[in-house]
Amino acid sequence: MVQCVRHSVLPRLKKDAGLPFFFPLKTNTKPLN
């Protein structure tokens, strides 16, 4: 699942500068894993 999430996150990280999008996503991915 992490690989799938990373693939959709990487392009967005470059678009949205990352921090505001990556932090809530990581919190949502932790319980899933």
Curated annotation (Swiss-Prot):
GO biological process: pyrimidine nucleobase biosynthetic process; pyrimidine nucleotide biosynthetic process
Keyword annotations: Leader peptide, Pyrimidine biosynthesis
Pfam families in UniProt: PyrBI_leader
InterPro entries: PyrBI_leader
Name the UniProt record assigns to this protein: pyr operon leader peptide
Organism listed in the record: Salmonella typhimurium (strain LT2 / SGSC1412 / ATCC 700720)
